[in-house]
């Protein structure tokens, strides 16, 4: 027996909605999704770069000091003043005719002082055991901090073998909580940079990187045409100065003033009332201002097509990607990298960030606040002990020097003089 008509219609509707909802996911492609769960060491190769010099650091698999989820572990830089390099090989792909999404999370738990927390996409063959700072890359993206002044968010792309940093001044987060950084590059060469799913910057590779010459340039030595009227307002030609306007005095005699009773005309002359401001005086006459009907706007140097510009429709296309890597140097270690995603679906990347914040953000903040409270109490106690120790040492020093002064006190010559005078 078949389904009733109304149930069959509902089933068809539900099936259609499901297909439409899942269709984008079915056609999206994930090239790398790494949450550093079991077996991650088999996927990632720790480089020996700088190891012979004793300058190579190691990574620790941990959730950190204030994890939103203690079971969600990443890899943390572990040794101070070291170079870190680790990479994973991924199925080779090209972003030609597709959107590229690069996303990861990093929690900079430490007072880093100076160091990077970015990731790189690599092309061609890479000896992963020798992967280091001089290894060519196709994209470098993420925070770089040094002191209190530099809090830069790098977006560096490689074009024809040369690296080009973004011209805009992008800032990274420094509050010791977990943050997601997302870079989206589209086939029309437009891009977006997101931090925690909030768009921090957007634009075009044509304008925000100095890769190609600009499409338009200003005309050199251009001059404003003589008939160009850039006066937005002009005097009203129909406004006429009232008759007698210029004869109105600025001040007039005070009519309420009275001659003093003791005024002596022979001695002081004829009394005159003091002057007061004239309320009828309007100052110099000025015609009313009206909109200029011939106003053409402020003159600007005209733009023309740049003869040196040659378009590259593949400007957005990176060399085929084969590896993802972390290569940084840090004065103070302690940054946790996690949730690395390389795909072509911005919606899927957004869902990962949304899920993390919905499930773990509040607990992470609570643990961080508690850790900060304990740190503050510990520092206050250490400061108290240091003050008490300093006071104790000061008292000992004063006591010791006091005894020495009394022991080696020099006689006062006046004492001898007094004895001499007494004898006299």
UniProtKB/Swiss-Prot annotation:
Compositional bias per record (Basic and acidic residues), positions renumbered to this chain: 238-260, 368-401, 412-424
One cellular component term from this protein's GO annotations in UniProt: extracellular region
Phenotype reported upon loss of the gene: Loss of seedling growth inhibition in response to the pathogen-associated molecular pattern (PAMP) elf18 and increased susceptibility to phytopathogenic bacteria.
Residue ranges of the motif Prevents secretion from ER: 421-424
Effect seen on changing residue 179 to Y: In crt3-6; loss of response to the PAMP elf18, but no effect on the response to PAMP flg22
Primary localization class, coarse: endoplasmic reticulum
Residues noted as binding an alpha-D-glucoside in the record, renumbered to the chain: 118, 120, 137, 144, 327
Mutagenesis or variant effect for residue 142 to E: In crt3-4; loss of response to the PAMP elf18, but no effect on the response to PAMP flg22
Composition bias type Acidic residues, residue spans: 228-237
UniProt-reported outcome of changing residue 115 to D: In crt3-3; loss of response to the PAMP elf18, but no effect on the response to PAMP flg22
Intracellular or extracellular location(s): Endoplasmic reticulum lumen
PROSITE patterns: CALRETICULIN_1 (PS00803), CALRETICULIN_2 (PS00804), CALRETICULIN_REPEAT (PS00805), ER_TARGET (PS00014)
Glycan attachment points: 97
Region: 4 X approximate repeats, residue numbers: 200-265
Entry's transmembrane regions: none
Region annotation (3 X approximate repeats) ranges: 269-307
UniProt signal peptide: 1-28
Sequence repeat ranges per the UniProt record: 200-211, 219-230, 236-247, 254-265, 269-279, 283-293, 297-307
SS bonds (residue pairs): 114-146
An example Gene Ontology molecular-function term: calcium ion binding
Pfam families assigned: Calreticulin
Protein name: Calreticulin-3
Lineage, highest ranks first: Eukaryota, Viridiplantae, Streptophyta, Embryophyta, Tracheophyta
Gene: CRT3
